[in-house]
Amino acid sequence: MTRILIIEDEISFSEALSFLLEKEGFETEVAETGKAGIASFNKSTFDLVLLDLMIPEISGIDVCRTIRTSSQVPIIMLTAKDSEVDKVVGLELGADDYVTKPYSARELVARIKAVLRRGTPEDSSTSES
């Protein structure tokens, strides 16, 4: 099952997002701060990270930077920050997509599936020889 880490400090939002994604067949884990998100990422394996930019303790930008030092797991920034500068910075730091709130649930699920499809075959396969 595809595992998604949601790093989002608004509990009602993260609960609704988890419900939506679990209904679509994904397994989710939620972290409410940047620090907790990095800790969760380091202790478990995830196929994708949904990352809010405005989170406590460590900013979403710094979380993205930290994850990128050790992993190429897909990151989708999911945030209310919708300026062109924010989008460009997020993508240049290594985000694979950038979705602004409010968003369409159908569009978000489609973007998640598209990013996961783009993963390289050697990244998603395990050697069973």
Model feature map: region roles:
Residues 1-123:
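N-terminal/domain-start alpha-helical segments
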